[in-house]
């Protein structure tokens, strides 16, 4: 590889790889030490973005109105924003929070064909969809024989698709996986085969729920909204309490062919890399500086609301700082965050009313 190619593209070509065209030179006399290397890459033209600047992305956000920016994000993940209400657009943004917020746990139950799997499969190569069969602890965490780290240790987002399904090929977790996943969702680390491993991977539980499609609400033959989950999960309050947000998938419309994007959005590879860089930024500082939560709220509820709020800030207001973010911008993110966590808490109260008593979830904005 020539010095120029190595300098400009070496960090990408020698790690994750990149699509592009290469000019390869044949020189049988080219040596490195005592070894001949007759084939040498002398030029490379990438098809995709190989270098990007998060600061440039943040600077360009300032040129858009909030509504136009949200529409751009919706278009980027493959949907036509003109076909959706503001509420549906906001729920699509919530689907993106696991991509920008590390160690984030989301559940979405809703009818089929609402674009859940489509979005997760097409947004980033660093997401992995467990779409069928039983997911074992070896596959997810660590393989004791091969010594390979599992997908939760390798990916940014792991999606358990069709968790709430009676189909034979639905995603299922064995007992060992549930115990390990429960600890991981709380701590961001896990022990497997005598090895302690950490990860920033976010977890998404996705599945179906019986829905009144016309009125966009679940059918009321459920005792609680976790009931469609597999038997081993549906009333495991320790597991369910680790979920940061419950996205009401029954509010999402069935996606028609005309609902897919037809205009301009960000290149998917570029957007995926930006999301990955945003994962490394801490936007919870915005909330610590400007928000107070009511006394009596559990630490898990507090953490859940902060993580959802921070994720939405990264998506919609990445250009804001704790000093210049507007109250209405904070309210937009936190109202959604409180609603999504409240849905989790209400189901826990229905499952175990003695363990989970009613507590007010909310927030108060304070002056700069």
Annotated model-derived regions:
Residues 250, 262-263, 273-279, 339-368:
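Extended alpha-helical interface modules used as scaffolds for assembling large macromolecular complexes
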Residues 196-203, 208-313:
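Phosphate-sensing "switch" segment of ASCE/P-loop ATPases
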Residues 1-76:
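Extended, charged/polar low-complexity intrinsically disordered regions
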Residues 59, 63, 85-89, 260-264, ...:
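Conserved phosphate/pyrophosphate-binding and hydrolysis machinery centered on Walker-type P-loop NTPases
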Residues 255-259, 285-358:
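C-terminal helical "lid" subdomain and adjoining coupling/linker elements of P-loop NTPases
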Residues 80-215, 220-227, 241, 362:
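Conserved ASCE/P-loop NTPase catalytic core
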């Amino acid at each position: 590889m020539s010095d120029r190619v190595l300098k400009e593209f070496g960090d990408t070509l020698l790690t994750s790889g990149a699509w592009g065209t290469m000019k390869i030179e044949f020189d049988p006399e080219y040596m490195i030490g005592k070894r001949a290397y007759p084939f040498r890459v002398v030029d490379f033209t990438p098809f995709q973005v190989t270098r990007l600047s998060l600061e440039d992305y943040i600077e360009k956000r300032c040129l858009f109105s909030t509504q136009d920016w949200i529409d751009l994000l919706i278009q980027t993940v493959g949907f036509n924003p003109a076909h959706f209400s503001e509420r549906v657009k906001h729920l699509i943004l919530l689907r993106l929070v696991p991509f920008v917020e590390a160690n984030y746990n989301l559940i979405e139950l809703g009818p089929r064909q609402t674009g859940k799997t489509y979005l997760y499969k097409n947004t980033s190569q660093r997401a992995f969809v467990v779409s069928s069969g039983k997911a074992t602890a070896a596959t997810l965490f660590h393989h004791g024989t091969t010594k390979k780290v599992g997908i939760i240790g390798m990916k940014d987002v792991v999606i358990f698709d069709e968790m709430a399904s009676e189909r034979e090929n639905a995603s299922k977790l064995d007992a060992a996986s549930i115990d390990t996943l429960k600890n991981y969702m709380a701590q961001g680390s896990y022990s497997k085969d005598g090895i302690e491993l950490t990860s920033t991977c976010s977890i998404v539980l996705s599945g179906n729920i019986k829905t009144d499609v016309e009125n966009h609400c679940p059918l009321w033959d459920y005792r609680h909204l976790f009931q469609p989950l597999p038997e081993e999960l549906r009333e495991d309050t320790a597991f369910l309490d680790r979920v940061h947000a419950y996205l009401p998938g029954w509010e999402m419309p069935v996606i028609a062919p005309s609902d897919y994007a037809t205009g301009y959005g960000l290149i998917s590879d570029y957007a995926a890399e930006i999301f990955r860089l945003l994962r490394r930024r801490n936007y919870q500082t915005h909330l610590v500086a400007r928000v107070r939560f009511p006394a009596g709220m559990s630490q898990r509820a507090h953490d859940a609301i902060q993580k959802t709020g921070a994720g939405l800030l990264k998506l919609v207001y990445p250009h804001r700082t704790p000093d210049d973010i507007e109250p209405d911008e904070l309210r937009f993110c936190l109202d959604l965050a409180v609603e999504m966590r409240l849905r989790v808490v209400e189901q826990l109260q229905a499952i175990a009313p003695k363990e989970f008593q009613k507590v007010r979830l909310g927030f108060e904005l304070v002056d700069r």
